[in-house]
Amino acid sequence: LINSSVCRDYIEPSTACIVHGNLQLDPRCLNFDMGNACLAFINAMDVVSGMIGQGRIKMGMIVDGESSRHVLNATLNRMKDPNLTDAEFRENFATLTLGSGSAAIILGSTRDFPDAPRYRGGAHLAATQHSQLCLGTEEKMKTDTKKLLIHGLELAGQTYAKASEALGWGPNTLDELVLHQVSKVHTDQLCNLLGLDTEKALKIYPTHGNVGPASVPIVLSKAVEAGRVQKGHRVGLLG
């Protein structure tokens, strides 16, 4: 059991520990938190997939729950300050795109679940020299939205190229795009940069906002519910 949530009720114990107890899982079930901002859910899928492939576990569950209420209320109160500078207003504005939601997924071996959709793995790159562009606490998130968009798209392009090479993706390989979503500008520019058809991407940012690590699994679930994902389709999970 891996919890990938950004939000948490306590520093200790881990949120995974609480979920494990609430579900009354077997004491032998390994449980831990994994934090990596909006990428954590997909990272956790890689970890579970790798452990299954190595024969260390038979199956694993990933959970994520995000609540934006506390930081949104704190930000709105801060932005009411008449002494707030224009720069301070702008660096707080991205916080207002945050949403709330939760998701979970279970991964198992193809031997035990021969008819289930297959997770094929992926690719990852880091540009940690830009890690100061978005700094968040329970009370405040400070974001340089312009630079974050520029450097984020740059990294996305590099990572997509690596994934395409590793997984054999061509321009029309993917039937559905499951995107981590922040805004219309971000979604449109990402698809334009990668040469992807925006009609293949179900948009949830108008109603859900940026739900952090839960965004990708929520989009995937809603795409399946809407009949956009059918047996045999190739689906790209882009964090």
Predicted regions and their residues:
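A glycine- and small-aliphatic-rich helix-loop capping segment at beta-alpha/alpha-beta transitions
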Residues: T15-D26, S49-Q54, T75-D86, L196, ...
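Claisen-condensing/thiolase-fold acyl-transfer catalytic domains that form or cleave C-C bonds
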Residues: C7-D9, D26, M34-G53, L153, ...
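Condensing-enzyme catalytic core mediating Claisen C-C bond formation in acyl metabolism
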Residues: D81-E154, Q158
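Short beta-strand segments
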Residues: S4, G35, G60-E66, L107, ...
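Flexible, glycine-rich active-site loops centered on histidine and acidic residues
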Residues: G53-L96
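Short coil/turn connectors at secondary-structure junctions
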Residues: D26-L30, Q54-G60, N92-F93, G101-S102, ...
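Short, well-ordered, mixed-charge alpha-helical segments that flank or form enzyme active sites
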Residues: D9-E12, A40-N43, S68-N73, A127-H130
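Glycine/charged-rich beta-loop-alpha catalytic/anionic-binding loops adjacent to active sites
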Residues: I2, G21-M34, N83-R90, E139-K140, ...
